[in-house]
Amino acid sequence: DAHSHGDLILGSEDAHLFKTTQGVTTEIVGQCGLSMAPVMPENLAATQNMLSMGTTWFPEDMKNWRSFARYLEYADAQKLTANTKMYIGHSTLRIAVMGMENRPSTDKELDTMKGILREAMESGAAGFSTGLIYTPSCYAEEKEIIELAKVIAPFGGTYASHMRDEA
């Protein structure tokens, strides 16, 4: 499944069966700018609120996922029957650094996002996704997206975009 939101239910009872019982052996998660990590404690509620469009169940351990590496430790401990590749969601990344602010990122905020994204790629993330029609990704200027995409390039990462407008 090249466009999955299965990460939103990872760890829930029988989550591992949803895809494999349909013959899906690989799924790529973290789509549309939504990923389960990174999460900063001060922005946990905002992250969960944003993700609630896809789930209302959140693991207790989520409050500890300051880094993508911590999230991968959690994911690796779950019962997975499908191969899983994970993108870092731009909305999740943006909330971790600047909450739900309706404005462009500052240079300092962008540098922080780039650092977190670089660490995620070093930890095994497959790429980066945006949901440019959804908040808070829609508040980003083109420069921010380009700069973040540059971070994943040396890793051979994939950039998956949900466009700004569907009209």
Give a label for each model feature.
Residues 1, 57, 100-102, 133-134, ...:
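A short, structure-level motif marking secondary-structure boundaries and short turns
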Residues 125-167:
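Active-site core of metal-dependent hydrolases
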Residues 12-126:
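Divalent-metal coordination cores built from histidine and acidic residues
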Residues 4, 31, 86-88, 130-132, ...:
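A cross-domain feature marking catalytic cores of carbohydrate-active enzymes
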Residues 9, 109-110, 141-142:
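A conditional alpha-helix N-cap/helix-loop micro-motif detector
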Residues 7-8, 34-38, 92-95, 135-139, ...:
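Flexible loop/turn segments at secondary-structure boundaries
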Residues 1-7:
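Metallo-beta-lactamase
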